[in-house]
Amino acid sequence: MKNITILGSTGSIGVSTLEVVSAHPDRFRVVALTAGNNLEMLRQQIETFRPQMVSVLSEKLAVELDRSLPGYKPEIHYGVEGLIAAATAGDAHMVVAAIVGAAGLVPTAAAIRAGKDVALANKETLVTAGRLIMDLVRDKNVRLYPVDSEHSAVFQSMEGQSRKDVLRIILTASGGPFLNLPLDQLSRVSIDDALNHPNWSMGRKITIDSATMMNKGLEVIEARWLFDTPAERIDVNIHPQSIIHSMVEYVDGSVMAQLGVPDMKAPIAYALTYPERVPTGVNPLDLTALSGLTFFKPDYRRFPALKLAYDALAAGESMPAVMNAANEVAVEAFLSGVIGFIDIAATIARIMDAHEAHTLSTIEEALITDRWAREKARELVGLVRR
């Protein structure tokens, strides 16, 4: 029986994780859950999984949750302290880090410090403080299992192989909803257009990141740290069918790939049960039903955010933190109708231009850098034309 904590249990990854847990009650016990402000869903999860501890966004929500629970009541925490309490809960063997954005950095680091293995769905943690987090992983001798479908595919394609034999990593990307839209129409796309992903069902923020391909840029940076591979050996291929989730090319010319229908339950289950595999309910892949698998290079004119991610990696380790923070603010501004779609990348570029990259010595320095970039981006979005 593996005891798990889920940070972000009411989000897309959290819900899928609990579906995997429900399918295998003999394997998993839920110790702690954290959520933002979706109390209705959290109440249902508490009733079903009876965690020892939960945490919500604020004290007000914690009081409201406590009053609304008719039966079983776990310990109720709130805020950053609540996230840390859940992440370090003594009974947990593994923490699923599924909080969206840089907000996941502090509790994920706390889980690692507490000696917990981590199933990492929060790519922003490694984008914001990659070297520091990986140093912590090695120091505490814990395992970091990738949950992102692309990184899970790379992880699986490297199993049993020597890292010195890896020539390059090839991350695949669907291209999102605007892959074939004429470039001159990108400035006019609506929020609903951007949220209409062709292949994956995800949260709002990551869906916008997929439309700009910033999501793939974040994944390039995450792969750099997860697999200790320099950016020049991490390529991105557009693969509209989303069947091959990523590939690894070796020095002998062999290419290992992981295939499957687009469903996050598969990589989640592998992270939870590694090195075993369990049934997930994911539909089987019928290759004969596919008309073909296509691949091509991304166009930086269409996806400038992807180029910004490579630029951030090249600039130095504080720059990805700045890029990520600016992106989070810009996406929030777009989803609020404050700026247009093409203004997202333009906002990020402006904030990156205003930052002089430097080495990050501590998690706190990474957080300070993150806060600086957010403040600058918030100032800027009020000046960007809609």
Swiss-Prot record:
Residues holding 1-deoxy-D-xylulose 5-phosphate: 123, 149-150, 174, 197, 210, 215-216, 219
GO biological process, one term: isopentenyl diphosphate biosynthetic process, methylerythritol 4-phosphate pathway involved in terpenoid biosynthetic process
EC top class named in words: oxidoreductase
Gene that encodes the chain: dxr
Gene3D superfamilies associated with the record: 1.10.1740.10, NAD(P)-binding Rossmann-like Domain
InterPro entries per the UniProt record, alphabetical: DXP_reductoisomerase, DXP_reductoisomerase_C, DXP_reductoisomerase_N, DXPR_C, DXPR_C_sf, NAD(P)-bd_dom_sf
Cofactor(s) needed by this chain: Mg(2+); Mn(2+)
The keyword Cell inner membrane is annotated on this UniProt entry: no
Similarity section: Belongs to the DXR family.
Residues that bind NADPH: 10-13, 36, 38, 122, 124, 203
Taxonomy, superkingdom: Bacteria
Role noted for this protein: Catalyzes the NADPH-dependent rearrangement and reduction of 1-deoxy-D-xylulose-5-phosphate (DXP) to 2-C-methyl-D-erythritol 4-phosphate (MEP).
Name of the protein in its database record: 1-deoxy-D-xylulose 5-phosphate reductoisomerase
